[in-house]
Amino acid sequence: MPIQVLPPQLANQIAAGEVVERPASVVKELVENSLDAGATRIDIDIERGGAKLIRIRDNGCGIKKDELALALARHATSKIASLDDLEAIISLGFRGEALASISSVSRLTLTSRTAEQQEAWQAYAEGRDMDVTVKPAAHPVGTTLEVLDLFYNTPARRKFLRTEKTEFNHIDEIIRRIALARFDVTINLSHNGKIVRQYRAVPEGGQKERRLGAICGTAFLEQALAIEWQHGDLTLRGWVADPNHTTPALAEIQYCYVNGRMMRDRLINHAIRQACEDKLGADQQPAFVLYLEIDPHQVDVNVHPAKHEVRFHQSRLVHDFIYQGVLSVLQQQLETPLPLDDEPQPAPRAIPENRVAAGRNHFAEPAVREPVAPRYSPAPASGSRPAAPWPNAQPGYQKQQGEVYRQLLQTPAPMQKPKAPEPQEPALAANSQSFGRVLTIVHSDCALLERDGNISLLSLPVAERWLRQAQLTPGEVPVCAQPLLIPLRLKVSGEEKSALEKAQSALAELGIDFQSDAQHVTIRAVPLPLRQQNLQILIPELIGYLAKQSVFEPGNIAQWIARNLMSEHAQWSMAQAITLLADVERLCPQLVKTPPGGLLQSVDLHPAIKALKDE
């Protein structure tokens, strides 16, 4: 048989073999998409265990009409755009293959509307080539995905589905994990037209324990020891059950989350088990709900088809950090249990649980940024320090550049024709649209360039600052806001709150969305250039800057932010320099025409050449 390119539907079905294991896999992927879209309410309707119908409706930001067809295409995503993004993933989804895979093994319909659109649009793919049809529809702001007749065209996969009850138990377990992670999101789950679970969004404080008790049971809550542990860039929060009172039923509660992503990680389980081993029997398992936050550059989530596992770059450090955090709490445990809220919470209708069928709970999801007031506040170990930005974090595994990069380095920077700043201004001449060819990196942060036989030296941090300012400055439309997976809640003074309210419209144009109450402000979304910054440091500094201003111009605020952003590169590579210059040439063509002295300096080789000739 000759080598040939597979049809799109067959290729998607092969990918679905890894992504879509059962109905619960579909629910997980779609709910994570809703969370990435900034949804605060998600309604999930299931029929016949998910084999007949899976419907996910959210109130997120929605999808534009022009992007609906792309949403159903393979490897199309809004989560990442470059290799650096892949090596510092902060969203739940990033591969852009879930919807394409699901639509290839079911009858999938996607209906969505953004706040800017007057009407909603519906898209579905059909046929051998998976052609996407888009038509008008009625729908509020947000997105609804309907998955009908899962595995209808793959009878072998459908044959391996378990009973309706078992498949729904798997779905129930997935929703349980997500509800534990996102206390700020309301999640409703129904099966065959009946409401089964209602997890209401709860504010900060004691009500988190109410939701914890509703999901994990009062027995776990009564034995739960709160953890709040921090060292450098690592933070551990959550609860671990007192091992002296752990029962087989409690031992099934094992949820861990890494940067908001539910995980099953042997390293984390081993660290917790080791900390509890003196008090656990040989056949006992610890019970815990833990949230680990780590520099995204120091963890690789792209190592498992279903994103169930991660790899830590400094696994021993992470292991010892978790071990010390859990051990410290166990050594300081008190006899009084966690405070229970006296207000009764309406109990959702229960269904018979089958946690064994759903697998042992090694998964977990992220808590909101504001930490629960812990029962124990262990003092940081000697030499520890408050969380700091990650200026020296190197993206990824420091991978060796392959042949593709060697070819890239030999290629001049892209010669794109930028739009003139003003309509009446003539287009730039072709030979002035590029800074030139990158020859090498000098002193880790300068690029040596060659153009038309002339040599110049360019400051990469200054170029990066100009690029960030261009990305942040709003044009005809506001800068796109990226919802934060974990909203940032900060305490502010009356003066700072007043300044924020005056600057709210300007900040909205920059893609910064927030809500304020009496004494706090909650940052809900930021523009893309800020996603990889340490917002716990940057946002308070921005608020302090705004409090000193009387006029709030988006351009001035964008300039201040650009000057205060931490560089993503401690040491520049040639590939990074080439990418940066291509972006600067595209977004800042005026810099190519008249570069400022702090950005580009000519290097005069004539004295050196003359000296060589005189010898």
From Swiss-Prot:
GO molecular function, one term: mismatched DNA binding
The UniProt record lists the keyword DNA damage: yes
A GO cellular component entry from the record: mismatch repair complex
Residues covered by region (Disordered): 362-397
Keywords in alphabetical order: DNA damage, DNA repair
Compositionally biased intervals (Low complexity): 373-387
Listed SMART domains: DNA_mis_repair (SM01340), MutL_C (SM00853)
PROSITE patterns per the UniProt record, alphabetical: DNA_MISMATCH_REPAIR_1
Keyword Protease: no
Superkingdom, natural source: Bacteria
Example GO biological process: mismatch repair
Function: This protein is involved in the repair of mismatches in DNA. It is required for dam-dependent methyl-directed DNA mismatch repair. May act as a 'molecular matchmaker', a protein that promotes the formation of a stable complex between two or more DNA-binding proteins in an ATP-dependent manner without itself being part of a final effector complex.
Family statement drawn from the similarity comment of this UniProt entry: Belongs to the DNA mismatch repair MutL/HexB family.
HAMAP family xrefs: DNA_mis_repair
Protein name: DNA mismatch repair protein MutL
Record lineage: Bacteria, Pseudomonadati, Pseudomonadota, Gammaproteobacteria, Enterobacterales
